[in-house]
Amino acid sequence: MKKIGIVMGSDSDLPIIQKTVDTLKSLEIPFEVHIYSAHRTPDEARDFARSARENGFGAIICAAGMAAHLAGAIAANTSLPVIGIPCKSSVLDGVDALLSTVQMPSGIPVATVAINGGVNAALLCAEILAVSDDELYQRLVDLRKQGAENVLKKDAEVASRLGL
């Protein structure tokens, strides 16, 4: 199975990435995590992106806040799928990062999830890999089924609590 590359702009993004890591682990998807900055370590970020396919990666998740150029910088240097996680900061509640991540020029796509959307970034990568992996596909089907069962259980609990 291809692995997922996870790149965050700084260690302040780790709480968001932890959810991504937990989701990938639960789906038994291998991954690596790195800190590269589009502004402070552009050469390292570029080198990682350019060699990602040869190093066994199937997709790359990038998490960054504020100017959030990381996903775009990575996408400019690879043809692998890049998923951007705009991270909330104390300035503009992450809207600046969302706009920086989602507004890419034609020809250099970045799939963008919600602000702090680490779980959905992992699930999107899993869906990409599951196109050619039946076992992973089944784990995703099972995960969705479990989610539906949890909602129905809560529905019954609320009805019971309200005496309905």
Each model region followed by its residue ranges:
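Short, glycine-/small-residue-rich phosphate/pyrophosphate-handling segment
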Residues: 91-138
